[in-house]
Curated annotation (Swiss-Prot):
Keywords: Cell membrane, Membrane, Transmembrane, Transmembrane helix. InterPro entries: Multi_antbiot-R_MarC. The chain crosses the membrane at residues 1-21, 51-71, 75-95, 118-138, 142-162, 181-201. Belongs to the UPF0056 (MarC) family. Coiled coil: none annotated. This is UPF0056 membrane protein AF_2111. It is a multi-pass membrane protein. It holds the Pfam family MarC.
Length: 213
């Protein structure tokens, strides 16, 4: 593959993961969960959450294909299942995010910095079923070592943006406002729904081909 092909693959991987992980849409959630803490504790929560989220995605994308092979599950089946979950998630965001409100309520009951960093921030907010599905699919279908590295790099870039959004959360929210961040989240949710439908149809098409239909 030439350089243009690699760049195109990297851009596709990055945009897919960015839309699914949704840094702008999840920023108000992070602010709501951490506003009762001091700046020092917010920094700790942010660092731990982004590192843990990236490690979860990295480990699952690298090992996910092998685990699926062990259980005899195809990537096409993962696409179908992941696409359905992604579509449900996108509808939830478009309708107001009832599950995210539940995450808020549970996190607000905890005073443990480590607990909040792991749940709900790292998992499932920043590394949910959709991100894991996309990571495994992208990594498994990467044709060579360079493409696999580009998938990992695209994930690292997205989580770097997540971290930067936490650091500059105050000016970002001042610029966009809470309603602006909500609008951005809902716009991304439309693209998320499109990705979900594409995953499902790709998976179904691959299933039909494998059955010679």
């Amino acid at each position: 593959m030439d350089i243009a092909g690699y760049l195109s693959f990297f851009f596709a991987s990055f945009t897919t993961l960015f839309i699914i992980i949704d840094p702008p849409g999840n920023l108000p959630i992070f602010i709501a969960l951490t506003e009762r803490f001091s700046d020092e504790y917010r920094e700790k929560i942010s660092k731990r959450a982004t590192i843990i989220a990236f490690l979860i995605l990295f480990i699952t994308m690298v090992t996910g294909g092998k685990i699926l092979d062990y259980f005899g599950v195809s990537i096409s089946s993962l696409k179908i299942a992941g696409g359905i979950l992604l579509f449900i998630s996108s509808v939830d965001i478009l309708l107001g995010g009832t599950r995210r409100e539940a995450y808020k309520r549970r996190a607000e009951e905890s005073i443990d910095v480590d607990s909040i960093a792991v749940f709900p921030l790292a998992l499932p907010l920043y590394t949910g079923p959709g991100a894991i599905t996309a990571g495994i699919v992208l990594y498994s279908q990467a044709g060579d070592v360079v493409m696999k590295l580009l998938v990992v790099l695209s994930a690292a870039l997205v989580y770097s943006i997540v971290r930067l959004s936490h650091i500059y959360s105050a000016p970002i929210i001042r610029l966009l406002g809470r309603s602006g961040a909500d609008i951005a989240a809902r716009i991304l949710a439309i693209f998320l729904a499109a990705i979900a439908v594409e995953f499902v149809f790709d998976g179904l098409a691959e299933k039909l081909v494998s059955m010679d239909l």
